[in-house]
Regions:
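Polyanion-binding surface elements
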Residues: 1-25, 49, 55-57
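Major-groove DNA-recognition helix of helix-turn-helix-type DNA-binding domains
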Residues: 15-44
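C-terminal secondary-structure termini that scaffold catalytic or DNA-interacting sites
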Residues: 59-66
Length: 66
């Protein structure tokens, strides 16, 4: 996938079904993609990184190595 689309927190929450607190807790633990700081007051996530993270979780569930 070569998707450069950026998404905001509400979309990340919708895609993952996580709360804001869970997303930030996973980021702090290094277990979820970090947001990209766009301006002093605005951040977004790479949609591609979110989908890659989901694919990684599926692989872990299925016993895959990738």
């Amino acid at each position: 996938m070569n998707n450069k689309e950026l998404i905001k927190l509400p979309a990340v929450k919708r895609i993952t079904t996580f709360s804001s607190a869970t997303i930030y807790r996973l980021i702090d633990k290094g277990e979820f993609p970090k947001q990209i700081k766009l301006t002093e007051r605005s951040s977004a996530w790479s949609l591609e990184e979110i989908y890659n993270w989901i694919d990684q979780k599926k692989d872990e569930r299925d016993g895959g190595d990738s």
